[in-house]
Curated annotation (Swiss-Prot):
Blocks transient outward voltage-gated potassium channels in rat ventricular myocytes (thus prolonging action-potential duration) and rat Kv4.2/KCNA4 channels expressed in Xenopus oocytes. Is also a weak blocker of calcium channels in rat cerebellar granule cells. GO terms for cellular component: extracellular region. InterPro entries: Huwentoxin-1. Pfam families: Toxin_12. It comes from Heteropoda venatoria. This is Kappa-sparatoxin-Hv1c. The modification Tryptophan amide is found at W31. GO terms for molecular function: calcium channel regulator activity; ion channel inhibitor activity; potassium channel regulator activity; toxin activity. Keywords: Amidation, Calcium channel impairing toxin, Disulfide bond, Ion channel impairing toxin, Knottin, Neurotoxin, Potassium channel impairing toxin, Secreted, Toxin, Voltage-gated potassium channel impairing toxin.
Amino acid sequence: ECGTLFSGCSTHADCCEGFICKLWCRYERTW
C-alpha cells in the first residue's frame, strides 16, 4: 500500500511514505 496518504500505518510496515504515516512513524520511533 505504498504511495497512499495512509501507507505504512501498520506497526510492522516497512513502508512509511504516506504523509500521515511519515509523521506517525517519526513519532513512534522516538520511543
